[in-house]
Regions:
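Outer-membrane beta-barrel pore domains
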Residues: 2-153
Length: 153
């Protein structure tokens, strides 16, 4: 009969519209590379959704990142070892609607330091350290170590 035992609020009569704009760039010159992205989104009818579902979705969001990398291996090698640094800033409460007050904990920034070892075309091993913070005064930054293997074709 389609019924479930969920205790989640019923938000089936609310619809949130999304309009998004983004810019992306990539630059490579010899051993140096850089990339970045900027995204801005506006959401409509968030006030009705927030009231119906006891949620706190912002009506506008914004985020960007900038990354720079340097390949420390000789340029003629097929393998690459990129040392990189990346800064990210994103705010999912850039704007809020109705009585919802912007939550500074949703305005986050991250600094990432790491390396990408490109074993062959389409295969990479990555490791990095991330320091994560928010716009909340006195909030403790959190750090984490990430490792992964990527395969692409």
């Amino acid at each position: 009969n389609g019924k479930t035992q969920t205790t989640a609020p019923d938000v089936s009569n609310t619809q949130v519209g999304v309009s998004m704009f983004g810019l992306d760039y990539r630059y490579v010159n010899g051993r140096i590379s850089s990339r970045g992205q900027y995204i801005s989104a506006t959401l409509s009818d968030t006030e009705a959704y927030n009231v119906a579902g006891s949620k706190d979705i912002g009506s506008a969001m914004m985020g960007y990142y900038l990354e720079g990398a340097y390949n420390v291996l000789p340029i003629e090698n097929k393998q690459k070892l990129d040392l990189f640094v990346r800064y990210e800033n994103f705010n999912t409460h850039q704007e809020t609607a109705g009585s919802l007050v912007a939550n500074d904990a949703y305005h986050r920034n991250e600094m990432t330091y790491g390396f990408s070892y490109h074993l062959a075309n389409g295969a990479v091993f990555k490791a990095d350290y991330q320091s994560k913070g928010t716009a909340v005064d006195g909030a403790d930054n959190k750090g984490q170590i990430n490792m992964g293997v990527g395969v692409f074709f």
